[in-house]
Regions:
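Active-site metal-binding loops of divalent metal-dependent hydrolases
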Residues: 13-15
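Short beta->alpha connector loops
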Residues: 54-56, 127-132, 151-155
């Protein structure tokens, strides 16, 4: 799918095939990923999706993303498996634990933005590896409003890279458990944790 529409925003992050375990049952082969859900939450054809999938990515998933993205020129398909994630949610859905993660083709993927994308006014860096988020931000030629998302896995395994990126963004999105892990303040209240995270350099939280 191609389009001459202006690029209002670039949405980048994970596109995955998930296995979800919750009180209602076990759900396999579910379309997941931060970029996929961020794209689908927006009005159709206002954002460009940037990401990678494997050759196991089902056509029904591709068609759904194609219907919502301005173009799929930046949705790369490589030989191999799509990023996979399995998670189990508490009965009240207040938290989850990761059962497994398989990065698949995303492990060797380097994003490459189009000229239009490099000059868009808004950039959403959805949850994915901080080194890939940084690579994409470095390609921007404009100075977009940057929204950054992450989750506990990357706080634990890529803390240094994540903190270097946080200071470059306009809005950093994080939940309570992630804030506790990032701030290292297990017994602190929300205000104290928020101050510690804002001290890392994001303009807002």
């Amino acid at each position: 799918m191609t389009s001459n529409q202006s690029h209002k925003a670039v949405v980048f992050g994970s596109i995955s095939i998930d296995k979800i375990v919750n009180k209602y049952g076990v759900f396999s082969n579910v379309l997941g990923g931060s970029a996929a859900y961020a794209l689908l939450a927006n009005k159709k054809n206002t954002c460009e999706l940037v990401g990678v999938v494997g050759d196991d990515f089902e056509k029904k998933h591709f068609n759904l993303l194609s219907e919502h993205s301005i173009t799929t020129n930046s949705l790369t398909q490589l030989g191999g498996n799509t990023f996979c994630w399995g998670g189990e949610y508490k009965d009240d859905f207040s938290s989850r634990k990761t059962l497994y993660v398989d990065p698949g083709v995303s492990e060797s993927y380097i994003p490459d933005l189009s000229k239009h994308s490099k000059n868009c006014p808004f950039l959403l860096l959805g949850n994915t590896a901080p080194n890939l988020q940084t690579e994409l931000l470095n390609q921007m030629q404009s100075k977009p409003f940057v929204l950054l998302d992450t989750f506990k896995l990357y706080i634990n395994i890529a803390n240094k890279e994540l903190k270097a990126l946080i200071k470059r963004v306009d809005l950093f999105c994080i939940n309570f458990n992630e804030a506790r892990a990032l701030s290292g303040m297990d017994g602190a209240d929300v205000k104290e944790m928020s101050k510690a995270i804002l001290d890392l350099g994001p303009k807002s939280l």
